[in-house]
């Protein structure tokens, strides 16, 4: 074998070994973001929902402060059920869906992790689209309002 080819092959193998230790990206979050963009008013971005109320974003505690925050509360619980009851990993679970006629269709057999997680995301995204966004509930003091 040509020494140059051997060197390239060795570099590829080392790269692949290193990649095996990289944790998976939360790919379904990309799907969830696309669903949210599809259902919310045009003047909003999905990022404006990332730190809203007590439950939209990482973690959550206390009582939801409004209907939109309740959407996130229900979504968090849906993911929790998917993990506990069905042994799914919602943050890395891939799934198939279609955005059509102002609704979202999830594909896959009922009861499979992909379908369960898609249904969680679908329900939350549609809820976002039907709930009022209150500017004063963005970036709230969670230590004060979410007990």
Swiss-Prot record:
GO terms of molecular function: calcium ion binding; calcium-dependent phospholipase A2 activity; phospholipid binding; toxin activity
One Pfam family from the record: Phospholip_A2_1
Cofactor section: Ca(2+)
Coiled coil: none
The organism's place on the tree of life at top rank: Eukaryota
Reaction(s) the record says it catalyses: a 1,2-diacyl-sn-glycero-3-phosphocholine + H2O = a 1-acyl-sn-glycero-3-phosphocholine + a fatty acid + H(+)
Active-site residue numbers: 75, 121
Protein name: Basic phospholipase A2 beta-bungarotoxin A1 chain
Natural source organism: Bungarus multicinctus
Lineage, uppermost ranks: Eukaryota, Metazoa, Chordata, Craniata, Vertebrata
